[in-house]
């Protein structure tokens, strides 16, 4: 996995357990001997490991290690199956290291494969065409080592996303069928009921993507006493009524894909759901309801020049955004962005280890690759400076909001070495009460800012304002390295 890479960050890949593998395990009969290995949190010893079947979930930055594991198992005569985002994008590459590959999601193909494997007739390629979660079994959380993860209560109640952004990996993964679909609400609520503790993290690319489903889910969660985090779009935040329902159900922090402050970039990347949306109004609306904001921003789009880093950071600080996640634009194989970059000769290499949103793997239009990488790191440094955290906290209307901002922003980045130490010492469980304590203080509305129905009156939409005035995929988050059956 990426755990063997020099670029590995424990805090990123030790957040969530590998739900994809635990979901596949739910389809197996009760008497099957199943072990889930996640090299992000503990090494895998191959010496005495010779199962009947090894299933490895592959994403781009773990591909090198995943293929090495697959080759090692095959040399021992183990049947190896590979699936995941990277396999679907580059099936010929993956097939060289596997007996079976899965293209697309596995809800329809995995049960067919299990029947074929039991009969000794397993195929080489299984391609998903039927998209439904109607027969999804409960996730085998009993196979996960919860104490090794910072956020053990992660959950996914939908697949895909209703939008078609050019840079998103998920477009390739869900090609050939529905790109967005959900569980039945009752099934989702039952899965939530099976989780202990108060805190939840929805890993769905867009929990608000189907308004009818989201509304029913939030109604069902009222009274559960849960505190939860999720991802949503600017458009969803500005939709009257839906945010209020989410907050009443326990929403305390939202990952929002702002991505860019440039209307030209939004158009080029087909991020139409953000066009002519008032970003500042979305942040105010979340803060008015006591919801913390984790803003996502992507650098390196064609309208970006070297000034984009300072402008973006200043905007985020000025809005009082609690945490920001910055990315270098990365053309993942299988995406429309990759195809454009390849056709234009702008790809610098195909070293998948470096396709990690931290390295410039293409030639930017208006700056050098080195300037793009330097600006990315500078953005992180500037946003998380103590003075910047203080300025962001001061943007809140009340003392409680300012203190929450300071605690969350500082706790997440300024103490990352401490988090890494806790992870390596396998003491992550002691940090969950800290997270729940911070989140329990959210949901309290800023003093002097009673929420009102959203109105655009007097506020110019993004597309008409000057720039001064941005999954999978958590695409990669939540995927483990190997399931041995």
Q: Where do the model's predicted regions map?
A:
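Flexible glycine/acidic-rich beta-alpha junction loops that bind and position SAM and/or redox cofactors
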Residues: 1-3, 91-93, 212, 264-269, ...
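Structural recognition of alpha->loop->beta junctions
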Residues: 93-111, 245-255, 311-326
